[in-house]
Regions:
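Outer-envelope beta-barrel architecture signal
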Residues: 30-38, 71-77, 98, 115-121, ...
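Gram-negative outer-membrane beta-barrel domains
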Residues: 109-118, 128-186
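Short glycine-rich loop/turn motifs that provide flexible caps or phosphate-binding loops at active sites
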Residues: 12, 40, 81, 121, ...
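A generic structural signal for short coil/turn motifs at secondary-structure boundaries
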Residues: 47-51, 90, 167-168
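Cleavable N-terminal export/targeting peptides
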Residues: 1-32
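Gram-negative (and chloroplast) outer-membrane scaffold detector with strong preference
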Residues: 46, 57-135, 185
Length: 186
């Protein structure tokens, strides 16, 4: 009688472990052909025109659509917008520089057969609206400039639910490195 009471829960436990392991190992790449994702993050901003005084703060948001299957991954096209902001210190306490950017972006996404994981690399190109200003004695200097901006980036996202996850991205883009969230809209 005692043997029967132990065997049933033991078999049930083994069956649950096998089901959990097999479900956790099923490859589900979050970014597929036809999917739409939105990401937003904050981090260290890139310095445009070398006119930043301190390390710039950067923020970026991007919207991507999965368009083409390319080998084991998906190629996406999208748009991104963001900015980098720097304020001076010391002798240049009134020095300010910022660049606002709007650009197109494309990336190749691959999930590595790990549920919820998305890694990617891509390129961006667009326009940057740069402004810096400072005071010198009684005079206020200000310069505005529109410039082409090009970037390259690598990143990874991990979806904790089918539609929400966390994202990190690094490269020579609007931000050098950033952390944020990602939403799968479709």
């Amino acid at each position: 009688m005692k043997k029967q009471n132990i065997i049933s829960p033991l078999l049930f436990g083994i069956a649950m472990c096998i089901a959990t392991i097999s479900n956790a190992q099923s490859p589900v790449s979050p970014v597929k052909k036809g999917s739409v994702t939105f990401m937003a993050g904050v981090g260290i901003g890139n310095e445009y025109n070398s006119n930043y005084y301190n390390q710039a703060l950067g923020t970026k948001a991007a919207l991507e659509v999965g368009l083409w299957q390319a080998g084991p991954g998906v190629i996406t096209l999208g748009v991104q917008a963001g900015g980098t902001f720097s304020n001076g210190g010391g002798a240049f306490n009134n020095y300010k520089a910022h660049t606002l950017i709007i650009a197109g972006r494309s990336a190749w996404h691959h999930g590595w057969n790990v549920k919820g994981l998305d890694t990617y690399a891509g390129l961006s190109a667009g326009a940057g609206f740069n402004q810096y200003s400072y005071n010198q004695n009684e005079n206020r200097f200000k310069q505005n400039e529109v410039m082409p901006v090009f970037g390259g980036f690598v990143g990874a996202s991990y979806f904790v639910t089918p539609s929400f996850g966390f994202n990190v991205e690094a490269g020579r883009d609007i931000t050098q490195i950033q952390g944020g969230i990602i939403l799968k809209i479709k």
